[in-house]
């Protein structure tokens, strides 16, 4: 639709990573001030607002902005959902994090399968709209059950990671770099080379 070469496409895809990278460090602070429930809901609605735009914009600069906001919303959701999971785990008094991550993956599989099924019956823009409306309904229905916890005290804007936290951060960086490369370029390869 935009008639992009691989260099411009690569720069556009980089906007997703830049958005995530810039939003993640501040999500903890924002969640502490306003509560992670609000952050989850706002980032979720931004994410869902970007999906139809990504399927329809015809300007490279507007696409770059949408991809940046898309990435920022994903980064904020990842961090705030993990904070929420920690609160739920603490309230339950038992280890639940691995189960949450498992359900995250199951949700991804169901979403991809549902979209593939819809594409068999509907035009891509309409299928995207159906998925977005379904997700908005889920957020509206279940978002009120998220724990609203924030922090009562003052928290620093940024803390330099040390020790095991720094090591985990480096591992997460490598993991996200690999995941992003496979997801972005793998989808393009399947479309261009395999026609799927």
Which residue ranges define each predicted feature?
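Flexible interhelical linker loops that connect adjacent transmembrane helices
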Residues: 138-169
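Conserved MFS/SLC helix-loop-helix module at the cytosolic interface between two early adjacent transmembrane helices
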Residues: 22-61
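MFS-fold secondary transporters
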Residues: 50-54, 70, 142
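Cytoplasmic helix-loop-helix junction between adjacent transmembrane helices
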Residues: 67-102
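Symmetry-related core transmembrane helices of the 12-TM Major Facilitator Superfamily/SLC fold
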Residues: 125-144
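Pair of pore-lining "gating" transmembrane helices in MFS-fold secondary transporters
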Residues: 1, 68-69, 162-178
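Short amphipathic helix-loop junctions that connect adjacent transmembrane helices
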Residues: 1-7, 184-196
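Short hydrophobic/small-residue motifs within alpha-helical transmembrane segments
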Residues: 17-18, 105-110
